[in-house]
Amino acid sequence: MNGLTVLKAMNGIDERFVAEAVSAKEKGKLLVLAKAAAVVAACVCLVAGGVYAYKSFQNSQLPLLEFEEIDFGGMGFEGSDSLTLEHSDDISPWNEQIKIDKLPVYKNLLYRYEGQEKSYFSEEDLLKVAQEYSELLGEKIISYEKFTDDFNERIVRNVIAQTQNHQISVGGDGGVSIVFKNPEGLTDLSAVKAKYPFLFNENDVLGKYQEFSVDGEPLGSYYKKYEKGETVEQSVVNYTLKNMRFTHSENGEIRSVNINTQQRFSEKLGDYPVISFDEAKEKLLDGQYVSSVDEVSYISSGRVEERLIRKVDIIYYTGNNQQLFMPYYRFYIWLDLRPFVTTGLPEDYEDYGYFYVPAVPEEYFVNYELFDGSFQ
C-alpha cells in the first residue's frame, strides 16, 4: 500500500508518482467520506507481511512467518462499493467453490522501512529498468529526471525518463508506468495490442473496471489484465503480483499502462498450506482478521456478522513496505455509512470495507495473535 492515500474526490494524480502507486492500486480504492457530517482522521496500523524466522515448523521445511505492525497515515478506510462491483468485470481466478491446497509466500527483496536505504533501488537500477522498456518501445531515452524521498534525499523514489513518444516512470518498488504521449486511436485494448504486442500474452485474462464517487457519480475507468497460469494457484499469484492496468484519458483513449513487476523482485520461501473458505469465514466471524475499518463506527452491531458478507476473493497483500508477500482471503463487508453521508445515494447503494484473513494456517506463524480484529 506504501501509505498512499487516494481520495475518491481527486480529479487526477501526479504522474511522477504513478509508478510508486502501482503496487497500491490493486488493493482496492480508499473510500473517503468527502461530504460526511464528520470526518475522522485515523492513523492506520495494518498488520501485514513481516519478517520470517529461520525456524522450521515441526515436520516441515517451511520457515515460520512472523509479523510486525506497519504504520501508514490515512483518512478513511480501504474498500469498494456496490456501483463499482456492478459496473466492473470480476476476473478473479478464484471463487468459493474452488479449493486451493497450497500457495507460495514470497520474501520482498525491495522491502524498505522509513530511513532504510539498503534493498531500495538506486538511481542506476531505476534507469536500467527504464532502458529495458525504452528498447521494447523501439526508442531511446532523451532525458530523465529523478525524485528523491522527502525525508532522505539519498533514496531515489522515482525516475521519469522521456522518449520521443513515451514517458517511462520507474518507482523504487520496481513498479513501471508508461504514458503514451500520442494516444490517438488507442480506444480499446485491441488497438493497444496491435501497437504494443510486447505488453500482451496469449493467455491474458482481461477485465474493465468503472469507479464511482461517494455521490454515485462515475469517475475514471480502466482495464486490468493478468496472464492465466497453468494452475489456479499460479493464476492467483499472477492476479496480484503480475498484472497490468490500462487507464483511460478524459477523451476515452487509453493513455497509460501501469506494470506490476513485484514478483520479479521477490524470492519464494515455499508453498504453504491454505485454509479453506469455510475456515477463513469462521476466523473472520471470530475476529481473527485485520482491517482499516472501525467496526464500532460503521457496523451497527459493532462486529462482523455473516449477513454482512457481500463478496470474497484471494489476493496477495503487497507494497515495498511489506517484508512478505502472502495470500489473504479478502472479505467485502457491508458498512452502514448513511449516517455520515448527506448526499442522496441510490436506495440499493452499499459501501464495503475490506477485512483480511490470512490464508496460511495459524500454526505457520510465530505471532498469529496479532490478527485480533482490533481497529488497525
Regions found by a protein language model. Give the residues of each.
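Helix N-cap / beta->alpha transition motif
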Residues: 14, 276, 356-359
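A short, surface-exposed beta-strand/turn
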Residues: 167-183, 234-260, 337-376
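Segments that shape or occlude catalytic/ligand-binding pockets
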Residues: 183, 191-329, 333-339
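Short, flexible helical or helix-coil boundary motifs
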Residues: 17, 137, 288-291
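Single-pass transmembrane signal-anchor helices and their membrane-water interface zones
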Residues: 10, 35-61
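N-terminal export and membrane-targeting signals
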Residues: 27-36
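Preferential activation on post-signal-peptide N-terminal prodomains/segments
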Residues: 55-237, 241, 260-265, 375
